[in-house]
Amino acid sequence: MNRAEAEQKARALVAQMTLEEKASQLKFDAPAIPRLGIPAYNWWNEALHGVARAGTATVFPQAIGLAAMFDEDLMEEIADCIATEGRAKYNAQSKKEDRDIYKGLTFWSPNVNIFRDPRWGRGHETYGEDPYLTSRLGVRFVRGLQGTGEIAGSGHPYLKSAACAKHFAVHSGPEALRHEFDAVASPKDMEETYLPAFEACVKEGDVEAVMGAYNRTNGEVCCGSPKLQEILRGKWGFQGHFVSDCWAVRDFHEHHHVTSRPEESVKLALENGTDVNCGCTYERVMNALHEGILDEAYVTRSCERLFTTRYLLGMFDETEYDAIPYSAVECDRHLDAAARAARESVVLLKNDGILPIEETVRTIGVIGPNANSRKALIGNYHGTSSRYVTVLEGIQDFVADRHGLAGDEKVRVFYSEGCDLFRENVEDLSAPGSHDRIAEALTVAEQSEVVILVVGLDETLEGEEGDTGNSYASGDKNDLLLPESQRILMEKVLDCGRPVIVINMSGSSIDLSAAQEKAAAILQAWYPGARGGANIAEILFGAVSPSGKLPVTFYRNEDLDAMPAFTDYAMKDRTYRYFTGTPLYPFGYGLTYGDCKAQISGTEILKSSEGEKAETGQGAFGSADPGQSAVGSDFAGVRISITAQNEGRETDDVLQIYVKDLESPCAVPGPQLAGFRRIHLGGGEERTYEIDLPARAFTSVDEAGIRAIRGKKFCIYAGFQQPGARSEELTGASCAAVEIEV
């Protein structure tokens, strides 16, 4: 069923409804209309990294870990797995007339906001700090969820599920202020940073839904903004439905004070495109109609949009997806995809040669509050796994499988929690200031040839306002330090005289300076999924090479002093594109057990077909005048040939292409990501790859928000990390570079 057919059916159905019935369908928990054969439907469903809050499901790595894979194909496969499980659960529950919250097919994922500030608690729900990476992964996630990508193939008449790009448009903290805050962003920052991922999801992913944010953007509430709707529907041609974040419309009159009462909020939201209200304010739709402040046409329009989505999902027809059985939930294919994702997501930040751990090691100490923590596996917005494997359990299982448990071959794994995640003591009755697990931790270290220290955060310390235990910051972080209890533990363990491997499990940048100075190795494991501990163990012992790359910059804590205030949405000194200091670990960085190098073996200027104009992006703030472009309208991009060679062990790695504009004063100061590809090379293997960089990669954005190709000379960099002195210092390798004129 195409959209035109779905719209026609929706109009015919809505035409049969009474005014009260139409109004009732605009709430997230839409009631049944039995006389028309319409069952109840709840629009609120979550699928950030697996079907969430709906019982058993495959729990994939948290979104920030999925971003660290730099793997578009696996991202789409994971989203397809999620959609399959969503359909399986929907099929089973619908037959039992269970149509409650979290049990539908409209998934409010992905989160394509930009992780602009490392303090933001919800940053681990995103794909990191780079607009290009976020765009590419967001598009593939949308296609996977909706069944419209390469994995699903062509010819499917219905959506497998409906994705939702959120939170439109300028939203990344502070969490404590989100219900009242006005995010002020310049046209340049909007077009260059905050809008591209949404634009890509709409224009390339054909995303079925977009969610408006809680905050205001440049003075207008995001769920009642004429300017944002003009960009979304007018400039980009969005045709799906628009949903408010939960209780965001109530914020209009209670916190933003742009209206004075619920009926006025209903009017502002509906007239400006918010079709479904997650919250209670649309219970006043009939009041607004009776008062004469709202035209029925807006109610009808939104109702038709919502039923268009339901028809596209096949909710009133028989579809091929009806046959998906419940046995698809946590099936072998999905668990395998989760395992591959966990392996690809782990980032090796340092290795003095201790990794992989030698088979001759017979005593291993595992220490730390996240070593045996299930919470540290799953992040937020998660489902429930039928089995969890913590880091400790993964290590125990791996050595048992490799060595057995008998005779001289036995490997002893000692364990100590070491400290609480953030409290001073583990036991409530321990003496204040005693740090009651430190002595045990040091004893374990003394007994061990190698120590694995597992630290970090979990969803109780970084997350969404109202959902975390970190109430003093409403989910955001005050700084980039580990909790004091963990810093004390780390200091003691790093000085224990044994080689220490630090595993940090967090969804954001943590200042690991102490570990960088003294640890033998460091792994950034994110929140790796329900069974991720098994995959971390595979990396520790060399069954798999680490190959993840940082989707965010890792700063030192003092770097926060140079950044704008958290409430300042200017991009100055934020992210790798504008940060002027020296990061602890740069965006795009990550070591492997291999030794991969890249050379640029050729470039080719691409031209568009006769009569076609290359897509550089119209831009939310208008198109460039022909005189602003430094190239002809037929310029379609650059094809770059890269020869990659691995002089070490077999490994995956990620080819990264960066472009620097050498002429335009509007360009970002340094090179920015323009292409990437995950590759696999055996030991000693050499292969050549071709990567096409679109014309948009050569654009810059001026202060008016106009995107154009203003320069003719560019430098293209190719390698396995971001170009720059810090990357070279950490990896011992530099990117290949070539200057071109387009």
Positions of predicted regions on the chain:
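Structured interaction patches on ligand/partner-binding surfaces of diverse proteins
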Residues: A733-A736
